[in-house]
């Protein structure tokens, strides 16, 4: 009898985010923290892609000719800016509800994104490949991080790159990202993050290494409550982002 196929999908996580789908593009709604967080993510992604592929970030469509996957794209908060910068963008999410919201918003703004209700393993098994993969705030929500990273890594073309943003598994992160953000300030619905599923940088580096990806840049991201804004930082105790590269053949 064949073994059941391994999956990266955590059904509870998909259900949780599907229930919030209508809120994706409301900057003052349930995803307000993500809207606040988005500018620092976008600037990091834009600058690093431009540097790695020799593009001028000041050009009108600097990412023309690049194929980008946003895995776990939600409502498309990263897909649309990448498409406006000229990239061919595939936005994938396990939640069909999220994908429908993303499609509707893109159509309203006349932005072309190839949205698909699918998984990393299905895309990888279909032979899809990309110059850039955006893996942002997803690894802490999957059922099998090693399989997920392996399947994503399989889709990165030689010389291509993958961004990963997540939350460190530290007591500081427990206090700020879970207790503070979800239970005290109520920035996020309770249960959005589970402490045991948060990912330490060394764990992420090991998973990436197993997928033939090498970390070439990393940065912390911290919140300034006085300025009400996020910024890059050396402090990786809570939120952090890494950039990993697949070597050329």
Swiss-Prot record:
Keywords from the UniProt entry: Methyltransferase, S-adenosyl-L-methionine, Transferase, Ubiquinone biosynthesis
Name of a matching Pfam family: Methyltransf_23
The protein's enzyme class: transferase
An annotated Gene Ontology molecular function: 3-demethylubiquinol 3-O-methyltransferase activity
Catalytic activity: a 3-demethylubiquinol + S-adenosyl-L-methionine = a ubiquinol + S-adenosyl-L-homocysteine + H(+); a 3-(all-trans-polyprenyl)benzene-1,2-diol + S-adenosyl-L-methionine = a 2-methoxy-6-(all-trans-polyprenyl)phenol + S-adenosyl-L-homocysteine + H(+)
One Gene Ontology term from the biological process aspect of the record: methylation
InterPro entries: SAM-dependent_MTases_sf, UbiG_MeTrfase
EC number: 2.1.1.222, 2.1.1.64
Pathway annotation from the record: Cofactor biosynthesis; ubiquinone biosynthesis
Binding site for S-adenosyl-L-methionine: 41, 72, 93, 136
Top-level taxon: Bacteria
Stated role: O-methyltransferase that catalyzes the 2 O-methylation steps in the ubiquinone biosynthetic pathway.
Family according to the record: Belongs to the methyltransferase superfamily. UbiG/COQ3 family.
PANTHER family in the record: METHYLTRANSFERASE, UBIQUINONE BIOSYNTHESIS O-METHYLTRANSFERASE, MITOCHONDRIAL
Name of the protein: Ubiquinone biosynthesis O-methyltransferase
Organism encoding this protein: Mesorhizobium japonicum (strain LMG 29417 / CECT 9101 / MAFF 303099)
């Amino acid at each position: 009898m064949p073994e059941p196929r391994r999956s990266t999908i955590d059904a509870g996580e998909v259900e949780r985010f599907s229930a919030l789908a209508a809120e994706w593009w409301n900057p003052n709604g349930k995803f307000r923290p993500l809207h606040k967080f988005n500018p620092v993510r976008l600037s990091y992604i834009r600058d690093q892609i431009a540097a790695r592929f020799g593009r001028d970030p000041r050009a009108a469509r600097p990412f023309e000719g690049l194929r980008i996957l946003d895995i776990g794209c939600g409502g498309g908060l990263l897909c649309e800016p990448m498409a406006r910068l000229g990239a061919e963008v595939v936005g994938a999410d396990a939640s069909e509800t999220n994908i429908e919201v993303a499609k509707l918003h893109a159509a309203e703004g006349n932005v072309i994104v190839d949205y698909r209700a699918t998984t990393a393993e299905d895309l990888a098994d279909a032979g899809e490949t990309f110059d850039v993969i955006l893996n942002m705030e997803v690894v802490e929500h999957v059922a099998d991080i090693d399989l997920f990273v392996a399947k994503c890594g399989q889709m990165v073309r030689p010389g291509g790159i993958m961004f990963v943003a997540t939350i460190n598994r530290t007591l500081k992160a427990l206090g700020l990202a879970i207790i503070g953000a979800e239970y005290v300030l109520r920035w996020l619905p309770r249960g959005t993050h589970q402490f045991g599923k948060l990912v330490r940088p060394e764990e992420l580096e090991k998973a990436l290494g197993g997928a033939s990806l090498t970390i070439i840049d990393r940065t912390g991201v911290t919140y300034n409550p006085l300025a009400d804004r996020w910024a890059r930082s050396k402090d990786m105790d809570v939120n952090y982002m890494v950039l990993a590269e697949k070597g050329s053949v």
